[in-house]
């Protein structure tokens, strides 16, 4: 290698002179256009200025004198790496003389070598042999040179008595192709520059700097002709030469112009990508350079955004600027201007430190022209660049590094040396070696030379105690240095390789030797003035010379930059070899490994562990003494600080100062726990706890939500409690940073009350230990209490409150006192406390009957907070009560030593413990009231009657209260335990009237009814009075349900005695039959009631099978259809004979007897007769929702009275517009541009980039060509936009969509349809999945539409980030929003499922696919898979992933309850057990956004509307703007209600459909009714559609439609019809609509309803048979006997009109042809009634609470 050869030559070349022929150093990454003469001239001036600072000798006169040529002095340039580079030439000065240019006529004589590619080359010296070069004209242009374009200049000074050497200039390569001409011109221009002809090269404007001479023109012509053969010239060059064959200048000018125009953009991009900055140039210049490049690129249409620009700039930062990469690389919104502010700050700090450096020489004013020499003994700090951050990290700027050396002997003193490097930089490979250095020399710690070094010189350092040098070629008598330690100003070690002598040969021919240390780890070669003074040499800075004490001048001193230098030419080279030095300093016996190196090698372990391991020889090869431990204590590894970052440690007991600083109840800790899932809405889901810092007193409060107002209420309560009860004011409240505490509402409240909030730091839960530990303790107690007592989970907060009471009374081990004692309260009286879950009997002071038992079993929870009573849970009523009327159940059968946990509370010790308290109650019980206080905040079922509790159980009513304790001993119960089967998800709608306590019938007379008694209809009315005493004496607290399946025969006139089973008895007792008249009397005068017996026991007595000529269903088919339907439970009624008045009722079609419940039957007749004795629940009253616009008419019926004319004065009811959905998406400006929520904005930006990347990945448009807007037909241009929204799972989504709403009709096929799965198909699939134990898997295909190609030629505007507003791109994929995208995707996925997955689409049901194992429901990009075998689903998923980006949302493999979010439905599914469908989370989020004032704290609505009122027909008198505003509001409200209703809330469809007809008639009345509906939805948002698995004993699928109609109750006398569809007893759909034709009778309306149900019933039947191969039974239930009769009849002559007859005949054909069973159902059990009319609260609940609750 060249570098190896040069390192062995004599250094005499340093003193040789050379004419300057190089005007600029050209780097490999230099702009190719930076060769113009103007730039060359600038560099020539800089070179001349540098040369003038050194003692030089004029060069040889062989150079032609030309005033435009560069100065003939030796050019000085900064060497790029390590030390001065010798000048290199390939053409002598004589050859460069214009007089000898004819030499180029003989190119073979030019010496040339392939590997000596430098433009200039100097031989090592006159004493070394010049190498023999092969003869060659030049290399072809296609052969790159290893160092092409690099120019190295001489850096040594020339003595006046030395002659210049010859110079060789390398010729340009040969041109070999016309395509390479411009590249060849670049090399040719460099050749001219090296030939000292840079001034004739044309500039950018085409003119040279000076005029060209004739000789130069000849030289130019000859060289151009030699190296650019005419056959390889491009055409435009030949055209120029054809005019003037000597016009080479024009060719050069034209070439430069072409290169500039063709490569400007590319050069700018390359320059920007290869930016480098380390502070060596002013920051302003660097900023100007970068901004100019970015501006040019932006002006040329290449937009560089801030993020990309900042990344390019930071990537090129080095030195002290490098840390900016790590401090700013995560800032998304960082701008170039902000980045340059940081760069300027560091640069100014560097300059300030440099300017503050003291000067080496004395102040001229102090010297007073004294030329006497002196020795500088001070130790000034000299600024040096520090490429790495120091350990102490005191400043980012470079610091002075004084170096001190010391021996390992006690007598060694420490001095300092300035200008040392700070940190070694390791070389990566041998190419990093510098010229003059052999590969065998140690290179692991070499550093880059500083830019301000004067090459070939030694730096004079007045503060250094030793001389240091990097090159070993001048060291004499080198030896190892085991006893020398060198440190810099920061006390960091500098490794020393060797110690030797440095010998000088000065101008007076004397030789002087001083000691020198060899190290490659410094920036400059340092010459210590202290060591020169030791040999009688001083530095005189007034004369700038080194001199002896006698005034003899030894050598000149050169000032370069801020420092003073002495030339190395006075040094005598040594004959020592470099390997010798390396062997000396790398001796294993002397070198110690630095601790940072060992620390990194041993996986960043700590120093203590490493030292211990070395001592115990667990790590071999080196010992503890081989490691330098001096920096181990203070060493900070930045990687460890980042990788091992931990939270700060909390000191135990550090919080004690707060206990001394604050008085009791002045410093509180608070925290919230929750939510607890799967609880009824009446039970709290959260609790908030408070703990006093000083007393440790604790409070807990239940919470149903974490809203601001709920938290504020609790804070207000506890602050008032502390203020009034303890006369203290809270000063500080410590809490975490949850949103419930950091909201503005609470902050203002605390500020208003003068309370200081104390928040924990981020992710520091340990700082909140008091509150966190309390919550953990209470939850542990809660789980234990519930486990021990067996109580249901919805009583969890009662266990929390019980634990709080106890914990406040227990003493702390530290303070030896309890929290109550600290607070000044008395201790807890344990005699008033019962174990949690203690079985008790509560007195019922108001039972349903006087002969019913007065005791109700319950479980004690905790002492009441608001009274002296106890909170007791009553499972039979599903309520908690606050009462003192209870008796503790005790039993001696279960002892503690038997470990029967169910009997632990029955021990007699409990009775002895509570004896005093019971005695106190007994003595005062006579004066107490029998009333019970119901705890309203945890009441599970407010609709239950509250008059069912009574006093404690006594043998007789006359037993005095004083015998309470004695009598209670008679009550014995073994192993009483709360029933675990109590559903924890119980809610208000779950409650039916309690089960019958006895099977004994009861007779109640008219008088008792009139006096306020209650009729009981849950027992037969034929039981004799004599049985009552037997019933009372044999009654127990729990009884079995009485079944009436055999109570009555099918004969309506003759009845036998009814067998009655007595609880606990073995004999059956009979009840004599009463007279027919008495039975009628009792029936007429009784109030209608509701029974809780199952449908299996009584429904068959009211079903009338219809047998057609074609179908004769068996009795088991009839029972099978009715058995599993969720029909309400009604009491069995004995067959009776109606009186004559009933026989004379008008015909069935008469308008006079039409009931609001529809149809005429026995039940309607009873209701009509007994309407004056309705119970309170049937009254048409309800709590008003607190909205200021509601008036006294707000609880109205949607059914108008018959006497009113129902005609609206606008056409709204005739043509209802489509309902507009609520806009849940955001535009780009809303989500990003003007979004003030920074966190949300960043998430939307991230979603934006994700969507753009997905579009590019899917090749949505053609990226090869952009079209001009003027060239494309406007009809084919589709506008595009970005929309943003937040999904239900909380993720942020961005979607690039097309504006299909303004798409031209010619751009899509209107016949194509976008199909999605029908909701009935989805519900059917879900129902079959439950019955057949299917696995349900939910999938999502990302960017589904983009997989479908688009056939039409469409163009869209590019996304905004591309910045091409005037361009268009052609679509290749079906973009979201296009009219045809849905259809294209449907066809794509359909073909894939059929061909690749072996599926087939169910005929008549689009998007439902099946094969032998799997069923798929497809809704755009969502897929729901149903399969008996989960592996079958996985197989389909694997196939889909081959083509589409398929995400598994829920695999559904768990056997426990799985939660899904399928098409808006929140589904809870447990295989083989149940499925629950609801929308609680969605409604909780969306309903408050409707701008409807909801009433969360008031009494909740029990029905969506009430019968009895009608919609007024008054004309609206409002202006146009208000009308549009109200219509828009109605569209939003009804839109959401309609979405929910048709999903699963089928009980609301009637109200939704009726209000939807009035969207364009937004009167105040209509709006109020709509608000009432929304309020009801809010109150019942937790309701769910409940499905249970079908009984496995029934192999058939049963599909049933229940039909109903309400005659003439709609505007224009239209009827409302409704149908409910059930599959295997599960409601899967419903429909409520206004009849399209005006019916003339109730029967006609019923026929119309049945005719609407049968087609859908048949379609569903086909779907069920396709998905499940079991046999299917189809049934239709209606409460119209006349409709059934018409369907059954064969008479065709009695139809009123042709339409009616056609409908009837069609029904007959469909019933007979489809094997359809038609049955009668009572109106009271017809659940389709809710689809056709508004119902009273009681009836509404009765018809819906079995299938939706």
Curated annotation (Swiss-Prot):
Residues 583-640 are annotated as: Integrase-type zinc finger-like. PROSITE patterns: ASP_PROTEASE, INTEGRASE. The keyword Transcription regulation does not apply. The keyword Repeat does not apply. Residues 1-97, 129-171, 352-421, 945-1166 are annotated as: Disordered. Residues 660-835 form the Integrase catalytic domain. Residues 1-23, 48-60, 71-97, 129-152, 999-1009, 1048-1076, 1089-1100 have a biased composition (Polar residues). InterPro entries: Aspartic_peptidase_AS, DNA/RNA_pol_sf, Integrase_cat-core, Retrotran_Ty1/copia-like, RNaseH-like_sf, RNaseH_sf, RVT_2, TYA. It comes from the Eukaryota. Residues 1032-1047 have a biased composition (Basic and acidic residues). The C-terminal RNA-binding region of CA is sufficient for all its nucleocapsid-like chaperone activities. PANTHER family: TRANSPOSASE, PUTATIVE-RELATED (PTHR42648), TRANSPOSON TY4-P GAG-POL POLYPROTEIN (PTHR42648:SF11). This is Transposon Ty1-NL2 Gag-Pol polyprotein. It comes from Saccharomyces cerevisiae (strain ATCC 204508 / S288c) (Baker's yeast). The gene is TY1B-NL2.
């Amino acid at each position: 290698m060249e570098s190896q050869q040069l390192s062995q030559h004599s250094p005499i070349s340093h003193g040789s002179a050379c004419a300057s022929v190089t005007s600029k150093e050209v780097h490999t990454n230099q702009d190719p256009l930076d060769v113009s003469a103007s730039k060359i001239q600038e560099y020539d001036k800089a070179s001349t200025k540098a040369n003038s600072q050194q003692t030089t000798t004029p060069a040889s006169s062989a150079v032609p004198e030309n005033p435009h040529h560069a100065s003939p002095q030796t050019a000085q340039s900064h060497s790029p790496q390590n030390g001065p580079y010798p000048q290199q030439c390939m053409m002598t000065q004589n050859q460069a003389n214009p007089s000898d240019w004819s030499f180029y006529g003989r190119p073979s004589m030019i010496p040339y070598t392939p590997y000596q590619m430098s433009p200039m080359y100097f031989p090592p010296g006159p004493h070394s042999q010049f190498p023999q070069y092969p003869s060659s004209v030049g290399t072809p242009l296609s052969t790159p040179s290893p160092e092409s374009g690099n120019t190295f200049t001489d850096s040594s000074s020339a003595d006046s008595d030395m002659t210049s050497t010859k110079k060789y200039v390398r010729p340009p390569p040969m041109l070999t192709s016309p395509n390479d001409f411009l590249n060849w011109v670049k090399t040719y221009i460099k050749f001219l520059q090296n030939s000292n002809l840079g001034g004739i090269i044309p500039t950018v404007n085409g003119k040279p700097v000076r005029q060209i001479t004739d000789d130069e023109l000849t030289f130019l012509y000859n060289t151009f002709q030699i190296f650019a053969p005419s056959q390889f010239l491009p055409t435009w060059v030949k055209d120029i030469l054809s005019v003037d064959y000597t016009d080479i200048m024009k060719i050069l000018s034209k070439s430069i112009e072409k290169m500039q125009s063709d490569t400007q953009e590319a050069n700018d991009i390359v320059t920007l990508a290869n930016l480098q900055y380390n502070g060596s140039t002013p920051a302003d210049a660097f900023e100007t350079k970068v901004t100019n490049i970015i501006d040019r690129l932006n002006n040329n249409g290449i937009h560089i955004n801030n993020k990309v620009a900042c990344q390019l700039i930071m990537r090129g930062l080095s030195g002290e600027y490098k840390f900016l990469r790590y401090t700013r690389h995560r800032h998304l919104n960082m701008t170039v201007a902000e980045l340059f502010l940081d760069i300027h700050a560091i640069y100014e700090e560097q300059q300030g430190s440099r300017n503050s450096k003291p000067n080496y020489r004395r102040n001229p004013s102090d010297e007073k022209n004294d030329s006497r020499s002196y020795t500088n003994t001070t130790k000034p700090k000299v600024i040096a660049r520090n490429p790495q951050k120091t350990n102490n990290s005191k400043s980012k700027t470079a610091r002075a590094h004084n170096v001190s050396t010391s021996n390992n002997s006690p007598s060694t003193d420490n001095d300092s040396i300035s200008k040392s490097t700070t940190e070694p930089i390791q070389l990566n490979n041998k190419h990093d070696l510098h010229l003059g250095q052999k590969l065998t020399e140690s290179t692991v710690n070499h550093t880059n030379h500083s830019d301000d070094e004067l090459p070939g010189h030694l730096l004079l350092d007045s503060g250094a105690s030793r001389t240091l040098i990097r090159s070993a070629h001048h060291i004499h008598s080198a030896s190892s240095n085991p006893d020398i330690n060198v440190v810099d100003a920061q006390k960091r070690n500098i490794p020393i390789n060797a110690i030797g002598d440095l010998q000088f040969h000065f101008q007076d021919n004397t030789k002087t030797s001083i000691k020198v240390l060899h190290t490659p780890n410094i920036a400059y070669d340092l010459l210590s003035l202290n060591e020169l003074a030791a040999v009688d040499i001083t530095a005189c800075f007034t004369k700038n010379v080194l001199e002896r004490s006698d005034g003899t001048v030894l050598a000149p001193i050169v000032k370069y930059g801020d420092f003073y230098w002495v030339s190395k030419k006075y040094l005598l080279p040594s004959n020592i070899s470099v390997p010798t030095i390396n062997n000396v300093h790398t001796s294993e016996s002397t070198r110690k490994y630095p601790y940072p190196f060992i620390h990194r090698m041993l996986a960043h372990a700590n120093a203590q562990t490493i030292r211990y391991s070395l001592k115990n020889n667990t790590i071999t090869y080196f010992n503890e003494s081989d490691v330098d431990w001096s920096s181990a204590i203070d060493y900070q590894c930045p990687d460890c600080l980042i990788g091992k970052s931990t939270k700060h440690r909390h000191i135990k007991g550090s919080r004690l100062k707060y206990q001394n600083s604050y008085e009791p109840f002045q410093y509180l800790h608070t925290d919230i726990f929750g939510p607890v899932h799967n609880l009824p809405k009446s039970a709290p889901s959260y609790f908030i706890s408070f703990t006093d810092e000083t007393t440790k007193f604790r409070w807990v409060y239940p919470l149903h939500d974490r809203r601001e107002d709920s938290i504020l209420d609790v804070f207000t309560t506890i602050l008032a409690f502390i203020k009034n009860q303890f006369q203290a004011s809270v000063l500080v409240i410590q809490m975490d940073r949850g949103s419930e505490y950091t909201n503005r509402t609470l902050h203002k409240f605390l500020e208003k009350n003068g309370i200081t909030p104390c928040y924990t730091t981020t992710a520091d839960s340990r700082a909140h230990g008091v509150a966190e530990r309390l919550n953990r303790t209470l939850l542990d107690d809660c789980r234990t209490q519930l486990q021990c007592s067996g109580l249901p989970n919805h009583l969890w907060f009662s266990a929390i409150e019980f634990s709080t009471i106890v914990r406040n009374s227990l003493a702390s081990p530290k303070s030896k006192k309890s929290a109550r004692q600290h607070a000044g309260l008395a201790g807890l009286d344990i005699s008033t406390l019962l174990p949690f879950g203690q079985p008790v009997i509560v007195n019922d002071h108001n039972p349903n009957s006087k002969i019913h038992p007065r005791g109700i079993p319950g479980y004690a929870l905790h002492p009441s907070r608001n009274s002296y009573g106890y909170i007791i849970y009553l499972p039979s009523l599903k309520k908690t009560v606050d009462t003192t009327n209870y008796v503790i159940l005790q039993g001696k059968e279960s002892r503690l030593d038997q470990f029967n946990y169910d009997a632990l509370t029955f021990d007699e010790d409990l009775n002895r413990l509570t004896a005093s308290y019971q005695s106190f109650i007994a003595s005062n019980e006579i004066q107490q009231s029998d009333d019970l206080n119901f705890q309203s905040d945890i009441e599970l079922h407010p609709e239950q009657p509250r008059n069912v509790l009574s006093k404690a159980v006594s043998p007789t009513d006359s037993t005095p209260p004083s015998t309470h304790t004695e009598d209670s001993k008679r009550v014995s119960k073994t192993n009483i335990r709360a029933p675990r089967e109590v559903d924890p998800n119980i809610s208000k709608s779950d409650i039916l009237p309690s089960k019958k306590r006895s099977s004994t019938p009861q007779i109640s007379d008219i008088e008792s009814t009139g006096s306020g008694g209650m009729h009981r209809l849950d027992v037969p009315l034929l039981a004799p009075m004599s049985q009552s005493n037997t019933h009372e004496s044999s009654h127990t607290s729990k009884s079995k349900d009485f079944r009436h399946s055999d109570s009555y025969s099918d004969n309506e006139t003759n009845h036998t005695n009814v067998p009655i089973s007595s609880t606990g008895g073995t004999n059956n007792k009979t009840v004599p039959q009463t007279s027919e008249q008495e039975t009628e009397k009792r029936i007429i005068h009784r109030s209608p009631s509701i029974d809780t017996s199952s449908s299996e026991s009584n429904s068959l007595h009211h079903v009338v099978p219809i047998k057609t000529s074609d179908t004769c269903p068996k009795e088991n088919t009839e029972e099978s259809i009715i058995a599993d339907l969720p029909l309400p439970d009604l009491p069995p009624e004995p067959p009776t004979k109606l009186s004559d008045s009933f026989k004379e009722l008008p015909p069935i079609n008469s308008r006079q007897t039409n009931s609001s419940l529809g149809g005429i039957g026995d039940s309607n007749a009873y209701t009509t007769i007994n309407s004056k004795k309705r119970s309170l629940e049937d009254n048409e009253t309800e709590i008003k929702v607190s909205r200021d616009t509601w008036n006294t008419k707000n609880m109205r019926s949607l059914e108008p009275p018959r006497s009113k004319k129902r005609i609206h004065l606008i056409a709204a009811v005739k043509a209802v517009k489509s309902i507009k959905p609520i806009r849940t998406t955001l535009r780009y400006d809303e989500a990003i541009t003007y979004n003030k929520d920074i966190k949300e904005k960043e998430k939307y930006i991230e979603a934006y980039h994700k969507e753009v990347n997905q579009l590019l990945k899917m090749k949505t448009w053609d990226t090869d060509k952009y079209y001009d807007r003027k060239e494309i037909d406007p009809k084919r241009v589709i506008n595009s936009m970005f929309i943003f929204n937040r999904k239900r799972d909380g993720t942020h989504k961005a979607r690039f969509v097309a504006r299909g709403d303004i798409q031209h009709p010619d751009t899509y096929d209107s016949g194509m349809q976008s199909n999605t799965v029908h909701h009935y198909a989805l519900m059917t699939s879900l129902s079959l999945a439950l019955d057949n134990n299917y696995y349900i898997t939910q999938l999502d295909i990302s960017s589904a539409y983009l997989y479908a190609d688009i056939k039409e030629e469409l163009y869209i505007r590019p996304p905004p980030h591309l910045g091409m507003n005037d361009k268009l791109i052609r679509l290749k994929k079906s973009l979201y929003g296009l009219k045809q995208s849905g259809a294209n995707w449907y066809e794509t996925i359909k073909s894939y499922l059929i061909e690749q997955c072996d599926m087939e689409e169910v005929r008549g049901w689009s998007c439902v696919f099946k094969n032998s194992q799997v069923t798929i429901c497809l809704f755009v990009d969502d897929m729901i898979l149903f399969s008996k075998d989960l592996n079958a689903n996985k197989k389909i998923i694997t196939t889909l992933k081959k083509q589409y980006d398929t995400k598994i949302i829920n695999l559904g493999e768990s056997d426990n309850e799985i939660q899904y979010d399928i098409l808006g439905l929140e589904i809870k599914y447990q295989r083989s057990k149940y499925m629950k469908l609801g929308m609680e989370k969605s409604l909780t989020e969306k309903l408050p956004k409707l701008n409807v004032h909801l009433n969360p704290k008031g009494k909740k609505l029990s029905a969506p509307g009430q019968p009895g009122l009608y919609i007024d027909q008054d004309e609206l008198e409002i202006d146009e703007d208000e009308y549009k505003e109200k219509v828009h509001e109605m569209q939003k409200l009804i839109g959401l209600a309609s979405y929910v209703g048709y999903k699963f809330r089928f009980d609301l469809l009637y109200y939704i459909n009726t209000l939807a007809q009035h969207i364009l008639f937004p009167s105040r009345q209509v709006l109020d009714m709509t608000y009432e509906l929304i309020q009801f939805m809010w109150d019942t948002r937790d309701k769910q559609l409940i499905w249970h698995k079908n009984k496995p004993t029934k192999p058939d699928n049963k599909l049933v439609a229940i039909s109903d109609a309400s005659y003439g109750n709609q505007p224009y006398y239209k009827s409302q019809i409704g149908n409910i569809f059930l599959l295997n007893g599960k409601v899967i759909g419903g429909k409520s609509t206004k009849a399209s034709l005006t019916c003339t009778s109730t029967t006609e309306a019923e026929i119309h309803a049945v005719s609407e149900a049968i087609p859908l019933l048949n379609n569903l039947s086909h779907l069920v048979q396709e998905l499940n191969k079991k046999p299917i039974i189809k049934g239709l239930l209606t409460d119209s006997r006349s409709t059934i009769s018409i369907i059954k009849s064969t008479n065709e002559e009695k139809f009123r009109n042709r339409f009616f007859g056609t409908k009837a005949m069609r029904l007959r054909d469909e019933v007979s042809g489809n094997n359809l069973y038609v049955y009668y159902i009572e109106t009271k059990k017809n659940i389709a009634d809710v689809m056709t009319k508004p119902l009273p609260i009681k009836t509404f609940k009765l018809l819906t609470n079995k299938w939706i609750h």
